[in-house]
Design a protein with these regions (language model features):
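Glycine-rich phosphate-binding loop of ATP-grasp-fold ATP-dependent ligases
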Residues: 71, 77-80, 110-135, 156-159
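Protein kinase-like catalytic core scaffold
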Residues: 110, 168-169, 219, 232-235
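C-terminal active-site "lid" helix and adjoining low-complexity regulatory extension at the edge
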Residues: 198, 212-216, 225-289
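A short linear hydrophobic-aromatic micro-motif
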Residues: 92-93, 109-112, 145-148, 218-221
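Phosphate-binding site of ATP-dependent enzymes
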Residues: 124-206, 211
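A short glycine-rich, hydrophobically flanked beta-strand micro-motif that places a catalytic Asp/Glu
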Residues: 149-150, 159, 216-228
Length: 289
């Protein structure tokens, strides 16, 4: 028995449909309803794996896909942004007032965000020192710190679902309003599936580089591309929405593969191989292993 563990108001449809499409027997459990199932959950000899869908609750099972610690790593946007900034995979970022003011004095427009955020909320575009100070005050009220980053004039944005170091699916974000800074699907727009042969390989390589900074087994990497083709990772989501039947099926195949073969990361070849070197072997017989 495989258990997909989710939080209230997060991943209901995604987990249900992925579970339905898996070949292994599975069930979806909401963490706030876990107590009354605890005995069944703890002692059922058929419980072989727990798949955490953005949920860090304690579970009585050692075989877990996405540990609580790994999820916490990427949920702490401030700490993970520092790590990505050191690896040069995100927009140039600033973590103190002095460096942010220096960037503004150089003529840069900045985006300021609190240390924890979601769905495009609490995003402030600043052009002046006064606007910066106002944004920092707003973020400080939330008690999670803040960071600033260069505003990137993007021409495309993707979500790359990475599992065990390989790509499960790629979707391009089509915004409701292209002028918005945050192309968040929760605020309008949609995800369009990208065919394997059309995968943006540079963006995928950068997404995997960011994923490799984590201890996640799987996650959805949000990445944008500017007019010069430069790629910048925004964040990694430990419970990326799966509204498309195609994407649900891809993730189900990946989970089934992990159950049979284990969750070890599959390294990438240094040779050129287009999409075949990046795709997970659960999805194509042409995948490089």
């Amino acid at each position: 028995m495989i258990t997909l563990l989710r939080r209230p108001k997060l991943g209901r449809t995604s987990c249900r449909e992925i579970s339905n499409k898996m070949s292994n027997t599975s069930m979806v459990v909401r963490n706030d309803r876990m107590e009354h199932r605890r005995e069944r959950f703890r002692y059922n000899p058929e419980t072989t794996m727990v798949i955490r869908w953005g949920c860090t609750s304690i579970v009585p099972c050692r075989n877990v896909l996405n540990t609580a610690r790994a999820i916490q790593e990427v949920n702490d946007k401030l700490s993970f942004r520092r790590r990505m900034n050191e690896a040069n995979v995100c927009p140039p970022s600033y973590f103190d007032t002095e460096s942010a003011i220096e960037a503004i004095n150089e003529g840069k427009t900045l985006v300021v965000r609190p240390g924890r955020h979601a769905q495009g909320r609490n995003l402030y575009v600043v052009h002046t020192q006064q606007e910066l100070n106002d944004a920092i005050i707003r973020c400080d009220r939330l008690g999670t710190g803040w960071y600033a980053a260069d505003l990137i004039h993007k021409v495309a944005e993707y979500r790359v679902f990475v599992g065990s170091g390989r790509v499960i699916w790629v979707a391009q974000k089509t915004p409701g309003n292209p002028e918005d800074v945050a192309w968040n699907v929760a605020r309008g727009g949609r995800f369009d599936n990208v065919r394997w042969g059309d995968w943006p390989l540079k963006a995928i390589k950068t997404a995997i580089a960011a994923y490799n900074l984590t201890t996640l087994d799987f996650g959805g990497v949000d990445i944008m591309v500017d007019a010069d083709g430069e790629c910048y990772v925004l964040e990694i989501n430990s419970a990326p929405s799966q509204t498309s039947p195609y994407r649900q099926e891809c993730v189900a195949k990946y989970f089934d593969y992990v159950i049979e073969h284990g969750k070890d990361r599959i390294p990438l070849s240094e040779e050129r191989g287009a999409w075949r070197k990046f795709i997970h072997p659960s999805l194509s017989e042409e995948a490089w292993e």
